[in-house]
């Protein structure tokens, strides 16, 4: 991976060697700027191994394929603005997005740092970065080290799910981190939500933007489960909760299968070996499917589920047979051969 900063501050009072119009080149230049580095990485690392981490972007830049949100400030309003920018970015066709955890400008309070760590680790890509001071957790307080570790561990366990979502995004173009209305177009309450998001097909995230830990978020219809606390929450209405630094609304969607890996120490491992399959609440007749890839992005395990009466029938294809199944709702899960 190579980080390209800048590329967007292109003056219009210049003369291009090939006679290009300086006004027309303003957006296109950033594409060429990042493409040059990306193509070099492809030559060195291979077609499917090149990764660019860029700030500037324009139409078509999603192929490079990771970007971050630029120089945000270390305060809660800027944290919320950062998410709004990411949601807009997603609706412009960009699948992978990051931001400077705890803000780039100024230095965050320990409180803000810990809240932003949870948000940052529940983004597709995560980076601690800033101006004028280091963003390592031990410079804030001991609890910051605990919080960062917990969410890093959680993200590592989520990698079978997240990498599977990344592969799906690569094939279909749906952004991994996206606004609610993309998944729930018929629910008008989702039209203007900009303080929460879907994190792939099966998870909803509502970052906390208040020092007192209060958060209000909306859940569409169905029975949802907080992945961290285990709480069951009825959808179809707004929720108001208070969370400590160790949790936030990280909700498992109804009618879904969430794979959790067996490794919380690193992001790259055998995702199918020892995977835990979390089966959420299923409506009568509802079906779900999830695919678990290997590190090359090839599907090695396919899991399908369907609610039949009082049971959820689960079918597993591929893998090495080393997996566990957990029903979040308590509904009996029957594993079919």
Predicted feature locations:
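Active-site neighborhood of glycoside hydrolase catalytic domains
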Residues: 1-56, 60
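Acidic, His- and aromatic-enriched active-site or binding-groove loops in soluble protein domains
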Residues: 21-34, 68-88, 200
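Catalytic core of carbohydrate-active enzymes
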Residues: 38-44, 49-50, 57-68, 81-85, ...
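A short amphipathic beta-strand at an alpha->beta junction
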Residues: 331-337
